[in-house]
Amino acid sequence: MKNKRGVILISSQEEFAKEFGRLCKEFNHLEIYTAWVGNPGNIIPFSHLENLDTVEVYLGVSFDQSSPDGIQYLIDKKYTVTIIDDKFTYHPKLYFFKSKIGMALLMGSSNFTYAGF
């Protein structure tokens, strides 16, 4: 539901995945701030990243929940990956899209994992 300020309320994983895919096509830069990254073999959400020029990932590794394959995939794709020290519980779920035309922010409870999408 869109209001006058451009805020959209997303109430399901399906809506979140659809909006994430749309924004990956509309914008050219994405900053991901997430507690965990999943296995790239699950395709979603990794397939959407192909539409972007640049991707920065700020990733938590607490509780050994991030997939080593997912981390390696991001590194192999030459995305900027910053792993946050696991001495602290790093638990954001923010997706910040930017381009010359504007910006958008998705936030909520979805980690960058198949289950989150």
Segments (PLM) and residue ranges:
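PLD/PLD-like phosphodiesterase catalytic module centered on the HKD motif
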Residues: M1-F117
